[in-house]
Amino acid sequence: MTTKSDFSDEEWSRIIRAPFVAGLAITLADPGGPFETAKESMAALKSATNPPSREQLLADVALDVQAMVQQRHNPLQGYKPSHSEALGTQVLGELRDVQAIVSAKATPQEAEAFAGWLVSTSQAAAAAAKEGGFMGFGAEQVSQGEQTMMGQVRQAVGG
């Protein structure tokens, strides 16, 4: 059983922000307006506080995320990808790196559960708000850009 104490402070900071980075990947794939972005962010937050598995590692992450929310701390604090054309690539690289950290120290089952959690978080963010259209008409629940990014998130974390 892997717990928070198995990771350095820097590693743990990256691990607890990973669900939010997975949600950010979706927002970057097809940026909508402020309401769509807020819905996607809230979906990522909900997923980050409700892991789909009972693995101790995921429970520890969720508890720390809940504490951050209660203290009104930004879960993406310290994560500042550069503003460039390669922003999506940087976000996927962060997810890949965090998954490598988890895979190196956690059991295979925990690493798989963590990867699945990141994928499900990206799916929740994508499904949270319709994209495109006009005043909701003709909009897609999950845009082509978001579908592509979900596949890239899955590939990045090996999920």
Residue ranges of predicted features:
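Small-residue-enriched hydrophobic alpha-helices in membranes
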Residues: M1-G159
